Amino acid sequence: MQCFLRDTDARMERGENEMLSQLVSEVRDVAYSIEIIIDTASILARENSRPPSLLGAISKGACYPVHCKRLYSIGKKIDQVTARVNKIFEEFAKYNIHSTCLNETRYSMDENETLRARRLTLPDLGDEVNVIGFDSEINQVKDELLDSENKDLTVVSLVGPGGAGKSTIARKVYNLVAKNYFNSCVWICISQKFTVYGVLKDIVNGVMENQDSQELGTMSEMEIIKKIHSFLKDKRYLVVLDDVWRMEDWDMVQAAFPDVKNGSRIVLTTRNSAVSNHPNARKIIQQIKLLNEEESIELFNRKAFPSYVVHGRGDLDSFRELGKILALKCNGLPLAIIVMGGFLSKNLRITEWRRMVASVNWDAMKNEGDIKAILDLSYYDLSSNLKACFLYITSFPEDYAVPVGLLTKLWISEGFIPNVRGSSLEETALRYVEELAQRCLILIEKRSSRCIKTVKVHDVLRDWGIGRARREGFLKDCSSRNEVETSYSNEMRAYRVVLYDSVRVKVGVAMPNLHTLLIFNAARLERNVFSFRGLNYLRVLYFDGMRERWQLPTEIGRMVHLRYLGMKGGTYVLPATISNLTNLHTFDARDAIVEALPIDLLSISTLKHVHIYKVESWSVWKTTMQSNLESFFIVLAANTPKQWEGAIERMEEKPSWCFGKHYQSVKQLEIVGACEDEFGVPNDLHLPDLQLLPHNLRRLKISCPNLLNDEDPMPTLGSQLTYLNVLEIGVKSYTGATMTCPFSGFQYLHNLVLHDLDIEEWILEDGAMPKLRILTLCKCTKLKALPQGLQHLKELKKLQVIAMPELDQVLCYLLHKAGREVIIRSSEEHFEHVQIP
């Protein structure tokens, strides 16, 4: 059926038959029905295969009639779906739609691409802060912000069409001046669907630390404005209002900004010149010019011919000539050039480039900011999986920095990531992120030396993607009750809903059979109206922006098809019925507090990932873990030391709750402790036996004061964890003076981080860490010299020494002379911890 849909997709791209959209909608409905049947059958099979016992046999016999009834129901549904599938294939024949599997040429990142994808290096990914043609504008805006003679509150407006580079210029200048020249700084995205309360709340959270969210939730808009005004009147502040659409948007928030003649500044970006002239304050208007011919060609070449594409090719002259034509046809609009270059970098076929020159309706580019033709081309060039991944990113609010760890877990839970030979689903998902970045469909917001951390979508691409997602029935974005309940004639029925604000409607009643529910700004969710009823087929549920305590209703236990449950912000109380979620793959509360963790949660047989920021109560001695867990971490944070004392005593007796035999499949583990002042955790917590760690661990981070005491952990870790790739030990986890990496230990370790330890001597025995590539030492101030054995590590590529002024740097010099990358920094500002996904 996927093969037939590709032919339908291609024909709809050519605009051959709009009636095909109804057929596509029917196929999607059937596909969701099939998924529900398969899930239901799997759940039934698991229930029927529980370990035998006398009580289990009695229970099984008593439930046998119910079991037969459910089997019969599944059979009936299969018959109904089969009939619908047969009817669809009849429609395929009617419209002369054929399978395209044999002649599929559209780019697809399958297993044949795995080796090539692994060769892609992150520095080659699009870095939108590295701008071309904007040096003059950047310097002018910077000079206006820092003009010492102008003490008035001044609004500096950047005006230009969508995709012209307004936000890029503003971001560049903001990064240059914010910290060094202003007391308070905040960046706020306005967007078309902004709420006054939401913007004011973001300003408060941006300029005031440790703000009480509950107090803020009880305040009126005018009270918040007065609060901001009172706070800023003693500060020299910089506020960026990005993407302001209407004059009244400014009117609603301007009262929050006092003019106390101290050189405070507001930067405003807009497509509407009337908005730039509207503020009742001193105004400086900067019209953003489009790129000239030389700049357009330079930007296009940078995006269309990255080093990993052109390496070894000798036929680029013809491409460059066509590239000049294409770059100039974009009329100097940077976003159009970037997306075009990203698209063509994946299509280095001369016939494709010539087709682009001849067939695209370039007249549309003459309209301000209209790059629909280029976006259509880039989108249709994606595989079906990448299309879904891109549209999914557009569901996040405008200017939202999307954590890659969250994004990949959502993609996997949605079923967008295929199984690729030799790669895990997580690895494939990360390559999808890289692929979309290389195509310039997403922006890299933050990255480390080894991975992308957060991404964004340009507002023009997001608007385009949201519109397409609605038309295709991929998702429905809603900011009001009317949008939830209304079906539009040009939209297919959606199975995914995104709520951006408080919506007084029972979503499950308005949209039965819903597949995905994403809720942003959840602090404004009216929980007395919101209900889980009717959401029994939900697979993905995510709350973002909760600020208060919320006891989830017991009805959540009915959502047996749920694969992903995510929470960000706030404190959650989980009902015991959560253990009924027998299809759950990921429980993600890495940015939330769980007040009490049900003891049966970790016994769910399908559960693979558990990430929790803080657990306030957990009966660890009663908890059993199933064997399929792949990643698990919790910031250890109980409220009373007595609870921990009891837990540790029992942990020594029954270590399976965290490190024992039932936990041996875990491949990555983070053990993090925090200070007693902040979390109430006693710093005398210790690990009873390192040999209880899972032997197949790939990544390990230990960052808990005194956890290892003064017993050197390296001999045990080096011999027991034979597959370990990444290791970080920090924050005085080990308190001894000597650290010894044993002979032939750590055979597969390639990244080692030692942070804030009191070691005075480090011994590296022969044969230890032969594959080490990256070594980072930070704030180990008592260490005077590096081990001589580092010179003999042939695979060592990079050494970082941070905040260690007393270290003898002779060995650093020798390593640098031998061609290794050596970085020495006096401040730990840029130190990066190991990331456990």
Describe each region flagged by the PLM:
Residues R84-A164, T168-V177, C189-S191, D202, ...:
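N-terminal flanking helix/linker immediately upstream of nucleotide/cofactor-binding cores
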Residues L55-G162, T168-K172, G198, V357, ...:
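Regulatory and partner-binding modules of innate immune sensors/adaptors
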Residues G198-D202, S213-V240, W245, S318-G332, ...:
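Mid-core helix/loop region of P-loop NTP-binding domains shared across ATPases and GTPases
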Residues Q2-C3, D7-G15, I203, V207-T218, ...:
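Non-catalytic, charged helical/coil tracts that couple and regulate nucleotide-powered enzyme cores
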Residues M1-P51:
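Extended, amphipathic alpha-helical segments that serve as helical scaffolds
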